[in-house]
A protein has these predicted regions:
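N-terminal Rossmann-like NAD(P)+-binding domain of SDR-like oxidoreductases, especially those catalyzing
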Residues: 1-122
Length: 122
């Protein structure tokens, strides 16, 4: 028996290495996928195989209002967006804090408001 699960998922950082693999697996299972990525480190090329099967939004997770508007339409969120370069983090402490802490807080706050489950990798 082949059951189609028609759920809507957001994947933050979906154009990155881990995120794009999550996106491809969700698409393979016939879910509706919304990729949220600001493309600072992710690449659209990573999504070329599924570009016609996803919605892509170039949004920064630090923007709570935009994130909340998107997540209110979802059944769940896979949060993979982050800045990860260790050397760069020493030079850009404030930016790394804003993205990795405040941005992640935005995802969890919106998930709480919208009663969503979050899969988070750290």
């Amino acid at each position: 028996m082949n059951i189609k699960c028609d759920m809507h998922f957001a994947v933050t950082g979906g154009a990155g290495f881990i995120g794009n693999n999550i996106v491809k697996n969700l698409v393979k299972k016939e879910h509706n996928v919304c990729v949220i990525d600001n493309l600072n480190t992710g690449k659209l090329e990573n999504l070329k195989d599924v570009k016609d099967k996803i919605d892509f939004l170039k949004i920064d997770i630090r923007n709570f209002d935009e994130i909340n508007q998107i997540l209110k339409k979802m059944d769940g969120v896979f949060h993979q967006a982050a800045l990860t370069d260790v050397q760069d983090s020493y030079r850009k402490k404030d930016e790394y804090y804003d993205v990795n802490v405040k941005g992640t807080r935005n995802i969890f706050e919106s998930a709480k408001i919208n009663n969503l489950k979050v899969v988070f990798a750290s």
